[in-house]
Amino acid sequence: MTETFKHQSVLLKETVDALNVQPDGIYVDATLGGGGHSEYLLSQLTTGHLYSFDQDDHALESSRQRLAKYADAGQVTFIKSNFRFLKIALAEQGITKIDGILYDLGVSSPQFDDAQRGFSYKKEAPLDMRMDQGAELTAYTVVNEWSYQQLIKIFFRYGEEKFSKQVARKIEQQREIAPIETTIQLADLIKEAIPAPARRTGGHPAKRIFQAIRIAVNDELGAIEDSVEQAIPLVKVGGRISIITFQSLEDRLVKTMFKEQATLPDIPKGLPIMPGTEKTVLKLVNRKPILPTEDELTVNHRAHSAKLRVAEKQKEID
C-alpha cells in the first residue's frame, strides 16, 4: 500500500519550521497526505503529540506505515475526517487548544496519478473527483445533472474560465444525446468548446474546468473557510498557522482570512485606545508569501504554484 501513495511534500522545512515547534507541544497536520510534513514535525517532538487528518483512506493507510514508529510511541493520532470538522474531531480527542497547525491544500500527487480517481484530464477514468470516496457527490453528477446556469456559475467562480458559457452549452448539448461518462470525453468536449486561438495559450484547455468541478465536488473553498475559522480560536497565543496554497482562489481566501484577523478595527477619531486593544488576533509572520526555491522547483515541478502564508496568534478573539 505504501507504494501507492508516494507524495513529495512541497515547502516541507519552511512550513514546519515556521510553526516554531515546541518539543512538548500539541500540533495538527490538517492534510496528512503522504505524511512528509507530519514526519518532519514528529521528528522534533519529545513529549508532544501530533493529530493528523485526512479523508482519503489510501493516504491514511500509507502514512500509518510510514509513521509507524511514532504511532507505536504514542506520539501521533490519525483522524479520518475532512478538516472542516477540525474542532469537533479534536474535542473528541479531548483537545481544546493546540500550539500550531499546518495545511497543505489541494489534491496530492497520488490522487492525480491514480487515473481511476478521475482528477486528471489526461487519463481515461470515470468522472469521480471525490477526495473522500465515501462522499455521495461525484463529478459525474455535476457534469450530467447540474443545470446550465449552475455549471456556468462554478466554471466562472472556481475555474475563472472566460469561456464558461461555451463549455456549459457544449456539455448540455452532449448530455441530451448521451451521458458524459469519462474524463477524456469531458476533456475533448471542453477542447471543442474553447476557440482555437485560446487553446494555444495558458496550458491544457481543460485545466480550469476540471479544477472548478473538483472544487465543487469537494466544496474545497467552503471547507478551507470552515476549518481556518475554527483553527484561529483553537491555536494558543504564540502559536502559529502555516498554510500552503496552490491556486489563486485558495490563496486569496487564506490571505483575506488572515488579513481580517491581523487588522485593527477602525477607531473613531478622538476616541482613546484602551490598553491591550492595540493588538490584533493574528500577526502576519511574512507580509508576502514564501515561495519554493529554485532547487525545489528543479526536483518537484508540482511546487511551481505553491505559496506559503504564516500567521501567529497574538491574542484571543474577544
Curated annotation (Swiss-Prot):
Q: Which parts of the sequence bind S-adenosyl-L-methionine? A: G35, G36, H37, D54, F83, D104, Q111
State the InterPro entries in the record: RsmH, SAM-dep_MeTrfase_MraW_recog, SAM-dependent_MTases_sf
EC number(s) stated in the UniProt entry for this protein: 2.1.1.199
> What chemistry does it catalyse, as a reaction equation?
cytidine(1402) in 16S rRNA + S-adenosyl-L-methionine = N(4)-methylcytidine(1402) in 16S rRNA + S-adenosyl-L-homocysteine + H(+)
One GO MF term on file is: rRNA (cytosine-N4-)-methyltransferase activity
| Keyword field | Cytoplasm, Methyltransferase, rRNA processing, S-adenosyl-L-methionine, Transferase
Which Gene3D superfamilies does the entry link to?
A: Putative methyltransferase TM0872, insert domain, Vaccinia Virus protein VP39
Primary location: cytoplasm
Q: Does the keyword Iron-sulfur apply?
A: no
Localization annotation: Cytoplasm
> Which Pfam family, any one of them, does this sequence belong to?
Methyltransf_5
- Biological process GO annotation list? rRNA base methylation
Its cellular-component GO annotations read:
cytoplasm
> Family assignment?
Belongs to the methyltransferase superfamily. RsmH family.
Known role = Specifically methylates the N4 position of cytidine in position 1402 (C1402) of 16S rRNA.
Name the record gives this protein: Ribosomal RNA small subunit methyltransferase H
- Protein's organism: Latilactobacillus sakei subsp. sakei (strain 23K) (Lactobacillus sakei subsp. sakei)
